[in-house]
Each structure stands twice: as structure tokens, then as C-alpha cells.
Amino acid sequence: MKRFAVLLLTLALAVCCTLPAFAADTIEVNEDVSVSDDYDWTRFKGQNITLNVYNWGEYISNGSDDSLDVVSAFEDLTGIKVNYTTFDSNESMYAKLKSGAADYDVVIPSDYMVAKMIAEGMLKPLNYDNIPNFQKIDAEYRNPDYDPQNAYTVPYMLCTTGIIYNTTMVDKAPTSWADLWDEQYAGNILMFNNSRDAYAIAAFKSGHDINPQSTEEVDEVVKELKAQKPLVQAYVMDEIFDKMIGGEAAIGVYYSGDAITMIDDNPDLAWVFPEEGSVLSVDCMAIPATSEHQEAAEMFI
């Protein structure tokens, strides 16, 4: 789960949303939403299309806390049904697509996974005539190394990793990744159940490059992770929410947007960006090569 980090793409589905580059009649979607542009949102009505969307958990506005229910508004506007399911790691998403166990029309992989999926022919090239809101993406996030010219993906969210801790259980605010190895928190530390992020944290902590140049570097970082293991209460992904919000652990590591959510639910929690730095990642919307509804999927994007 990577909830609401930094939003890169604002969908046209917003309250009284207007795209200033266009002039057209306003479509009233429901009591909360209207759309005014010349994009033909209704061209698939009556065609009984279902889009299978596979996203990180709680990674789109869903109507909670008085927010807009984007999926519901999209369905009302377009007549397209959305079958929305979630995953908690790039690797589990990749494995499911690779195995052919399910067919998806929109997926949200992270930057490094995008490069892998492109290389393996797992994504369709996008037709940007069907994605006019791409013009709203900041130039800094266009034409990335992992997807030159954004041929296959639209950047969706930006996030970092950091330390979340319970201020009633941690006397001094942590400042370093090394605090996740502090023996005073033995049995109260939550670590990523995600090899890529866990490796990066141990590399930062030990002063190594997160992109190793030798097997010796890898071995040294792995030693750090092995040394930490006796101190760890649990290796987690989404499980961190219940544990940190419920006061079951003192300190852990997770994504920036999710930390905000946890802090909202438990004001005793706080989040810090470690002094050694952190990993910055971009999650992207893409269409699997097996999708049979590319144009409708591009409409959703």
C-alpha cells in the first residue's frame, strides 16, 4: 500500500472540473461531479465493457473521509464497469501478470518494474490521443530513463520511504536508518517484507551504494540485514497499518503517503526522513499487453 504520496496526475473527474484548453458542453455525472471538455467520455456506453484495474491498496480516492469516489464517478460518466483489485508489492503484481492467472487492463507498477515489464514485452504502447490529461504532467516527470518518451506509462504517484515511530514508545526522535538496528527497540521493530526496499535501507545505513557494483558489496549489506533480524518483531507490508496504529510496535519503515494516513489515525505517531537519504520512486499507470480494452483503459488513465 502506498497511499496518497505526491499526486502527479489530477483526473478530469473532479468537482466542477474544467480543462481550460477545451470548450464544450458540461456533462453532469452525479451530484458531486461534472466534466467540461471535448473528450467523448460516453462513447462506450451500452457496450458492457468491464475494465480490470490492479493497483496498490488505497491508492485512489475512494469516497472515504468525504473524498471523491473516482472509480464510481468514472463508471457513472462512461458506462464502463471497473473491477478494482489491489496488490501490496511490485513482485506479486508482476508474478500474477506473468503467470497469466488473471487478465488486467490497467496496472500501476513502480519505475524499476516498468523497465522490466517493457523489456519483457508485457506492456502496450499508449495512444496519447486518448489521454489528453497527460499534458498536465510536470515536465520533470516526462521522458524518464525507465520509459523513454513515456511510450508505455503515465506517471501517477511519487513517494519516498522513511521511519515511522510511536512517540510514546520512542524517547528520542530517530534521525538515521541505524535507529532500526537499535537494540533498545528489540522486538518492537517493523521492517519491510520487500527485498528491494529492505536492501536499500541496509545499504544507506552501512554507507554502501544502493546500486551495488560487486558481490562483496551485496554480501556486506546482507550481513547488516542478518544482524538486524533478531531485533525485528515482524517483516511487513500492509500489516504495518494495524500494528503501528494499534501501538503494537515502536518503530518501523514505510512509504511517505502511508505514514500520513497512519498518523491521521493515531496522533502518537510521527515520521522522519533519515539523514542518509532515501529512495525516491515513481508509480505509473500502464496497460498490459494482454488487455483487450486498450482505448477504454486509456480513458481510465
What do the PLM-derived regions correspond to, one by one?
Residues 1-9:
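Positively charged n-region of N-terminal signal peptides that target proteins for export
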Residues 8-16:
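Bacterial N-terminal signal peptides
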Residues 15-29:
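Sec-dependent signal peptide cleavage junction
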Residues 52-67, 88, 102-248:
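Extracytoplasmic ligand-binding site segments that recognize negatively charged/polar headgroups
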Residues 83-85, 233-235, 270-272:
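General small-molecule cofactor/ligand-binding pocket signal
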Residues 114-116, 245, 251-268:
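A ligand-binding cleft/hinge motif common to bilobed small-molecule-binding domains
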Residues 258, 264-301:
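Extracytoplasmic/periplasmic substrate-recognition and gating elements
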